[in-house]
Amino acid sequence: MPQTAGPDTIRILVSTDNHVGYEERDPIRKDDSWRTFDEIMQLARTKDVDMVLLGGDLFHDNKPSRKAMYQVMRSLRKNCLGMKPCELEFLSDPAEVFEGAFPHVNYYDPDINVSIPVFSIHGNHDDPSGDGHLCSLDLLQVAGLVNYFGRVPEADNIHVKPILLQKGKTKLALYGMSNVRDERIHRTFRDNKVRFYRPSQQTGDWFNLLTLHQNHYAHTPTGYLSENMLPDFLDLVIWGHEHECLIDPKKNPETGFHVMQPGSSIATSLVPGEAVPKHIAILSITGKSFEVEKIPLRTVRPFVIREITLATDKRFKGLEKKQDNRQEVTKRLMQIVEEMIAEANEMWRSLHEDSQDDEDEEQPLPLIRLKVEYSSPEGTKFEVENPQRFSNRFAGKVANQNDVVHFYRKKTGTTRKPKEGKRELPEGIAEALEDSDSISVDALVQEFFAQQSLKILPQAPFGDAVNQFVSKDDKHAVEMFVMDSLSSQVRGLLQLDDDKINEGLDSHIEDFRKVMEKNFLSGQQKQAQRRRRFKEKPEGWDSDLNGHWTLQPEAIEELSSSPEPAKEGGRVRPASRITVGDEDNLFEEEEFVQKTTAKRAPTTRATRKTAAATRATTATKASAPAKKSIAAPRGRKRANPFQDSAEEEEDVIMDDDDDYKPAPPVKAPPPKPARETQTRGAPKTRQTTLNFSQAERPTRTTQKAIEISDDEISEDDAFESMPARKSKRY
């Protein structure tokens, strides 16, 4: 396919699972991921494509490092920004397909010159989380470098709306569906709660392209998305998440569409699927037809993997009968590894032999993986060396010098008896732990809960919290989950009547657990946003030796969630939520705390004497300073809206007294509201001079968005849609 296409051809560079930031702390492999991503972006510029389509997992970590974010932004800015005009005409309503502070396509922004737009969905590694439900793609979108689409706000009610693009006579409907937990999306498709929208004009002329990020194969009965669940009006599906490169499109005979699996651009696990040569694809769409040009990636580190069985391999025949055969077995295994290293180096040279640009490039160390099954007949034995020690023999020759070899025994039908006082692991978990290459946190949790039942804590949120703790490095995920679940159970039990309590609490606890489980599976229950409160740093604490004080577990005093409604005089009054700049709510909460505290504190003779002594002591002082001493803390709090609400409440409670009546907060000095009005008015005046809407571009002022409607599907189709709304335009 020529690099320059005709006026009716849309050229798209397709790539998935870049995993920028993978092994960035490894002294040898630290730069592999971003170098390959930079090569992909350079190919987009040199091949003169119209756009780049990324299928999720751009970053390896949910919270990418500054280095990873810097390298991605540098590569995007270097290769995707420029004066070359983008020939793609955007026909959708941007508010329907984009979210965030700038809900429009970046190459229509009058302040940014984008020559190659990048469209991306998120995967399971870079998915939204935390306060604000943001992800790394939101940062790239707000910087104008990426068009982040395919969000799934409700996992149990998914609406997939396309981005409508046109170049010449070719019309492209680009659908995106970001990653959802596989069991949940499988159930959502099964329950017919996924609706695809189609253009209302010239429906049959559009090339329908879908990109998603899910399990492609049945790892578990419901832990994947079947191709047959997708609607048959699609023309091509770009399948992310699977790392094996199967980039040649394959047609599904039942649905009629083609499926392309580009695979990852870097090996993140030492398995056979990662050893397939890595490619990216340039997809050329003309009308309703398409062509694929696959391009091998040159910066990928060569990877060779083998698996041998010592009992059947001719090179080890008879060694199991000899005593002290460890040295001989190690020697022959080293010869096999040397052959694999030579094979990997030859692969790299053959890929670069016709390239003049890479003559001065140093050949990288290869990735080598040798899986050895060393079980032997009864009465014989293969003695193998420690895998760490064996791998270190190849330091300076391989990139993975700590895990070159993996020894394992053949699984037998005999079961081991657990020692007294120790519980045996379930069979599935034991097998997963033995095969370290295929171990998965989700699989371990599911297998464990299949053998062990929970009485109070809900199972699905528990598994999600463990996954957040391990995969997303959220140190407080499990703690927050347990606190939320227990507090919900306690609140539910306190609301029970005496008759229900006498019947027994076990059934009610089980009912509450099922409700929490159901709410989580439907996406209604999320982990509460919490504000951490830290203790004061001890004197003499050395951050260089002991680390930052705020990162220590003993530094956290409490994790306070959003305040629950408090009762006042038999009436339920919701506690005020303190937000930055919300001064009225700040004082309202202080007043509310004072009232409730005063009511709860019992009045005794001792307290009355203390109050009288306090008033007598106060009377001896000057009256003006005494009044200011009460109002001063309020003034400081008003000036600093970022102060922790918990500290404010403690200060108010300490100063509270039974006989003291605080001044109502509504009698605040009038100049402060006046200043607030002025500060609010200034931004409005400035904002009228700046308009970042799509209509500012002169060439698009007369353009109208094409309406899209949900797909018309027959009654016996598995994707029956809800009735279309007549008054709403898409």
Curated annotation (Swiss-Prot):
It is found in: Nucleus; Chromosome, Telomere; Chromosome. It holds the Pfam family Mre11_DNA_bind. InterPro entries: Calcineurin-like_PHP_ApaH (IPR004843), Metallo-depent_PP-like (IPR029052), Mre11 (IPR003701), Mre11_capping_dom (IPR038487), Mre11_DNA-bd (IPR007281), Mre11_N (IPR041796). GO terms for molecular function: 3'-5'-DNA exonuclease activity; manganese ion binding; single-stranded DNA endodeoxyribonuclease activity. CDD domains: MPP_Mre11_N. GO terms for cellular component: chromosome, telomeric region; Mre11 complex; site of double-strand break. Keywords: Chromosome, DNA damage, DNA repair, Endonuclease, Exonuclease, Hydrolase, Manganese, Meiosis, Metal-binding, Nuclease, Nucleus, Telomere. Core component of the MRN complex, which plays a central role in double-strand break (DSB) repair, DNA recombination, maintenance of telomere integrity and meiosis. The MRN complex is involved in the repair of DNA double-strand breaks (DSBs) via homologous recombination (HR), an error-free mechanism which primarily occurs during S and G2 phases. The complex (1) mediates the end resection of damaged DNA, which generates proper single-stranded DNA, a key initial steps in HR, and is (2) required for the recruitment of other repair factors and efficient activation of ATM and ATR upon DNA damage. This is Double-strand break repair protein MRE11. It comes from Chaetomium thermophilum (strain DSM 1495 / CBS 144.50 / IMI 039719).
